[in-house]
Amino acid sequence: MMAAAAGEGEAEVTREVISVSTEKAFEGKALPAWSEQITVRSLVVSAVLGTFLSFIVMKLNLTSGIVPSLNVSAGLLAFFLMKTWTSALERCGVFPKPFTRQENTVVQTCVISCSSIAFSGGFGTYILGMSKKIAEGFDEAEAKTSINVEEPSLGRLIAFLFLVSFVGLFSIVPLRKIMIISYKLTYPSGSATAHLINSFHTPQGAIQAKHQVSILFKSFVGSFLWSLFQWFYAAGPGCGFSSFPTFGMVAYSRRFYFDFSATYVGVGMICPYIINFSLLIGSVVSWGIMWPYIESKKGSWYDAGLPKSSLHGLNGYQVFISIAMIVGDGLFNFFSIVLRTAYDLYLKRRGGASKQPQETPFAGATGTERQVLSFDDRRRTQVFLKDQIPTTIAAAAYVLLAAISVVAIPHIFRQLRPKHVVWAYVVAPLFAFCNAYGTGLTDWSLSSSYGKLAIFIFGANIGAKDGGVVAGLAACGLMMGIVSTASDLVQDFKTGYLTLTSPRSMFVSQVLGTGMGCIISPMVFWMFYKANNIGMEEGFPAPYAKIYRGIALLGVNGWDQLPRYCLRFCLAFFLLAIAICALKEVAKQRGWWIQDFIPSALGMAVPFFLGSFFTIDMCVGSLVLFLWSRSDPVRAHTFAPAVASGLICGDGIWSLPSSILSLANVNPPMCMRVFSTATNDKVQLFLRTLPTPP
C-alpha cells in the first residue's frame, strides 16, 4: 500500500521534461571520493532521523496499514539538520567540510532504509499475525495451538531481521548496471528524490528549502500540541475527540466519523486524490451497504450468538472479502508487471541482436528511446561506473548469508525446516529481479504480493498440524525482506546516479541504514506492543496483521470454514478487483480520459475491514489540498508536502511520550464522551441514584 500511494503521487514529478542541464550547474564543484561522502555527522543525523521516522511509520502501520512516502520529509529534515550542524560549528569558529549533495543523498538513503524496516519488517503484518493477541480474534481451535502461535520476542525479532534484511542487498548488486545504465529504468520515486536533493544545493533551491522547513516545523508543532490536547480527554475506551460522532450516532456505529487525526489529514494531502476517493467508495459500499445487509441475515446465514471476532460470523465476511479484493488486485498487478517485464526484456534482446532500436509499448516508461547521451548522462554514467562493487564479493556474501539463515531461521521459527529456507533462497533472487525491474517501470513494489504467495505455498505444504500458519507467515517475512530491500537498493542507486553519488557509498549507506533499522524498529515496536492495545479497535487495530493471519488460515484449512455465501461474495469481489485493475490498465494504455477517475481496488478493500474513520480524515486532507490549489496553486505545489509532513510527524512523534506515559501508568485525567438522547437520560437517572460526594 505504501508503494501504491507513494508511487502514483511521486511519479508526477518525474514526468516533467528538464531541458536545462543539471550537472552544468555543479561543474565547478569538486566531486568527493566515496569514502568522504560517508561522514560521522551523516551517520549521527541518519540515526536520529531514522528513529524519528520509525515511530511515525510504526504508528501508521499499526493503525491503518497505509504508509505514504516520507522521502520529502526525510529530504527536508536531513538538509535542515545538516545545515544547522555546519552553521553551528562555523559560529563556534570551526569550519567543517562543506555539506554536499552527495552527503545529502547518503543521509537520505540511510534514513529511508532505516525507517523502511518498520514497514517491511512485518510488525503490522506477519510478525503480529503470529501473536496470541491476533490469534484470539480467530476461533479456529487448531490455529490457537502452541505450534500455530509465536509471541513476539525482542531478541528473536532483531535476529530474524538481521538474517533476512541484508540478503536482498547482495542479490541485486550484480544487476545494478543493467538496471540503471543499459535499461535506463526511470524509478520515479528515486528520480524525484534526486531532483529534490539537486534543487536543495542550488542557491535558489536552498532558499526555498529553508521556507519549506519553516512551514514543516510550524505544522509539526501544531500537530504535536493538538495530539497533546486530545490526550487529556481520552481516559478510556470511546473517550476523546477520536470518538466524536461527527455525522450522528447511527453513522458512528457504522464507523463513519471524523476522528480529528492530524496524521491522516496529512496522509490525505500526500496521497493522490484517486486513492482517497477509492477509500471513500470502499467505505460506502462496505459499511454503508454490505455489512448492514449481511448483519440483517444474522440467525439465517450465521449463528446470532457468535462473538464479534468469530470468522464464522460477520467478521468472516469482513476479513475474507477484503482479502479477496487485495489478492485479486495483487495477482493482476503481479502478472501484469511480470508479463511487461518479460516482454520488455524480449524486445530489448531482439533489438540488441538486430542492432536496431526497438519501439516497445513501455518505451516511455523506461526511457530506452534515447540515442544520444547528453552531457548529464555522460557525466553520470562516468561516475556510476567508477566505483565498482565486485560481483564475486556480492555472490559470496549472498551464499554465506543464505547458509547462515538455513541453519539459524529454523531455530527462530521451529515450524520452518531447513529445506523450506533453502527453497526460499533459491527463488528469491528471481523474484527480487522481477520486483526491482517492475518497480523501475511502474514505481509499484509488489513485495507484499510475493509475501502473500509465500504464505499460501508454504502454509499449504506444511499444514496446520505442523505449524503451517506460523511457517507461512515466517516464509512471508523471509520473502518480503529479500524482495523489498532489493528494489529499495536499485531505487537508491538511481538516486545516486542522478546526484553523482558513488554507488559504493550508496551501498554502504544502505547497509548501515538497514543495520540501524534492524535494531531501532524492533525496539520501537516493542514499546508500542507493551504500552498499547495492539490488535484492539480501541488503540492500534493492526488490520493487516489479521488479514495476513486470515490468508495463512486459508492456506492451511481451505474455504470450508467460511460462513454461508461468503465464498460467493469473495469470488465476486475477487473478479471485481481484477476487472477494475484491467479497466484502469486499458484506459491508461489507450489514453482514455476516464483513467484518472477509475478507483483503486486495493484502496477500496482497506476500509472493508477497518472502517471509515481514517477515510474521512484523508478526504479532509484532499479537500484542504484541493481548495489550497484552487486559491494559490504555486504555494500549494511548493508547501503542501511540507505541511502534510509536519502534520504526520507531529502526531506520529506524540506516540513516543504517549507510550512512555502509558508504561509509567500515567493516564489521561478526563473522559469526554458523546451519548444519544436516550442513553443520556439513562445515564442521568443512574447518576441520581449515586450518593452525593462529601
Swiss-Prot record:
Tissues where the protein occurs: Expressed in root epidermis and exoderm.
- How does this protein lie in the membrane? Multi-pass membrane protein
Give start-end ranges for the coiled-coil region(s): none
Query: Where located?
Result: Membrane
GO MF assignments: oligopeptide transmembrane transporter activity
**What GO CC annotations are associated with the protein?**
membrane
Q: Where are the bilayer-spanning segments? A: 38-58, 62-82, 110-130, 154-174, 215-235, 265-285, 319-339, 393-413, 421-441, 467-487, 506-526, 567-587, 608-628, 643-663
Which terms are listed as keywords in the entry? Membrane, Transmembrane, Transmembrane helix, Transport
Function, as annotated, reads: May be involved in the transport of nicotianamine-chelated metals.
Family listed: Belongs to the YSL (TC 2.A.67.2) family.
Q: In its UniProt entry, what is this protein called?
A: Probable metal-nicotianamine transporter YSL8
